[in-house]
């Protein structure tokens, strides 16, 4: 309960969160009014939400540059009316994703870590710059990281179908994973594990 209040307080008092708020507003406008996320109307709506007014400079413009299918992640959040509450929930989800990715990375590496060291590692995972900043800004990075780490663990354990699905889902943010994905898929093809490629391609096609 105390942790929940802290997250809610942080989401309300902190001026960040532009990445999440833009996509949340884009998703709401798209679902409720059929407004394209790439339109001027969507950009102005997000700007009013974030700045309280439309953008005064090009640097402030809230123009969507992500693939349309990436909005699927934000659809459940469109049910939340209050942007502060929506952002608080999203921050909690991202925090769980960071912790889960950290734990799975321990299994992936085969690191035999003592409980105290693990706790320190998990604390560091959340509160170092590259863990804490995406949580505060609301970036999708932690979720994509969790998908990639899970996919690599599935590859390690020879669950190729699951690995392919997870890699396909990681394309929610293509700029983050494209190089790694191409490398892994070529590795799979040349090592007789083509199902990784097929399931990744199929999942991406469904998106």
Go through each PLM region and give its residues.
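TM-lumen/periplasm interface segments of multi-pass membrane proteins
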Residues: 1-95, 102, 106
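Transmembrane-helix signature of polytopic, membrane-embedded enzymes
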Residues: 102-127, 162
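Short aromatic/hydrophobic helix-turn
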Residues: 119-132, 169, 186
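Perimembrane helix-loop-helix junctions
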Residues: 179-204
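Short acidic/glycine- and proline-prone juxtamembrane loop motifs at membrane-interface regions
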Residues: 133-141
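Membrane-interface helix-boundary motifs at transmembrane edges
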Residues: 106-116, 158, 187-196
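Specific aromatic-rich, kink-prone transmembrane helix
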Residues: 143-159
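Membrane-interface alpha helices of multi-pass inner-membrane proteins
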Residues: 161-175, 179-187
